[in-house]
Curated annotation (Swiss-Prot):
BP term (GO), one: tricarboxylic acid cycle
Signal sequence, renumbered to the chain: none
A Pfam family this chain is assigned to: ICL
Organism lineage string: Eukaryota, Viridiplantae, Streptophyta, Embryophyta, Tracheophyta
The protein's Enzyme Commission number: 4.1.3.1
Primary role: Involved in storage lipid mobilization during the growth of higher plant seedling.
Catalytic reactions of this protein: D-threo-isocitrate = glyoxylate + succinate
Subunit structure of this chain's protein: Homotetramer.
Domain of life assignment: Eukaryota
Enzyme class, broadest EC rank: lyase
UniProt protein name: Isocitrate lyase
Amino acid sequence: TRGMLAYVEKIQREERKHGVDTLAHQKWSGANYYDRVLRTVQGGMTSTAAMGKGVTEE
């Protein structure tokens, strides 16, 4: 079996070619919204941000 490589070759590349939004799951999951809420509540600083340096969708 080729596992993840087979998924990338057969599914994910086609999704990327067609601009499928779910490839960037943090964009459609609301991560940016919740980060803004956390920053507002915590006075602009948070250590639990879902988006930012080091995330898979930089």
